[in-house]
Amino acid sequence: MLPTVNNNIVIALDAMGGDFAPLSVIQGASFFLDNLVDPGVEVFFHIYGDQKEISPLLSKYKKVSDNSEFTHCSDNVLPNDKPSFALRHRKDSSMKAAVEAVKKGKAFGMVSSGNTGALMAVSRFILGTLPNIYRPAIASVCPTKTKSFALLDLGANVDCNTDSLFQFALMGSIFAKIALKVENPEVALLNIGTEEVKGTDSVRGAFELLKNAPSINFKGYIEASEFLDGNIDVIVADGFVGNVMLKTAEATAGTFISLIKQEVFNSWMTKMLVGILLKPKLNKALERFNPKIRSGAMFLGLNGIIIKSHGNSDAISFAHAIKFAVNAISENLNQKIINGVSHIE
């Protein structure tokens, strides 16, 4: 049964994490309540942070205040804190308190825009992993020219063995069914070629396990040059490769969009022509790559739902990260991962 208050889904919020916190967090919660709650779903927040900063915001955003409980925390995790430092010395941080709310059953998930490494360390220490899961992985939804796909690991594990990559594929497949609404997700391993003999020992070992796993719709290897084609639903890599791939893609997309705007809008004539002829289609195409509606990475494999929003998230971005958490809870993601792993074991 889901943790609820008066039948509401409960989400813990780290109000002090992120470049624009706590304003972005409280505004994000307000935007979520006003615009992103599905019919029949009610959400309640446990908010953790500095009372001097949070109280005026809760007075201003009445709907958030009416649908939340606030707890003061005397400390917060800083962007440059090492994971070990945050774990040992930030004892009364808003991040730690929000994760502990999940551990204690006060909430079933938490959202933070704070330090990624610290959040993973704190979450793993407090919550632990799901039964039979070796390592957690960071997963996110990425756009392509035709559809979205799930990518993991995005940095939790710099080096992975065969069994971890296999479990990432399993968790990624279950995650994609929920996040992408795909009934039988197609899964691929990221590699330097599509031939079976290529890749590291871990990647080749995972290939052998996956091609003999009936519960996973495995399609073999995929190269980085192919991932934007939209032919695969889940791409699996170790955290080092996955993180580099994601950041390279984000930087390339950002540069390309900037170049288009620079060239297209360099004169009043082209501005007018684009406004008349192309603006609706251009906006529709660019919306697919809008990071604000994809602001959320999930820490898969932990014994609780943990969502990491971008560090520079604004209110809309943070609201969509909350939505991400609510969907995972509503779909009972972790129980489905437990069931999936038990069938393999």
Swiss-Prot record:
Pathway annotation from the record: Lipid metabolism; phospholipid metabolism
GO cellular component: cytoplasm
UniProt enzyme class: transferase
InterPro entries tied to this protein: FA_synthesis, Phospholipid_synth_PlsX-like
Catalytic activity: a fatty acyl-[ACP] + phosphate = an acyl phosphate + holo-[ACP]
Key word Nucleus present: no
Compartment(s) of residence: Cytoplasm
Molecular function per GO: phosphate:acyl-[acyl carrier protein] acyltransferase activity
Entries under Pfam families matching the protein: FA_synthesis (PF02504)
Superkingdom in the source lineage: Bacteria
HAMAP family noted in UniProt: PlsX
Descriptive protein name: Phosphate acyltransferase
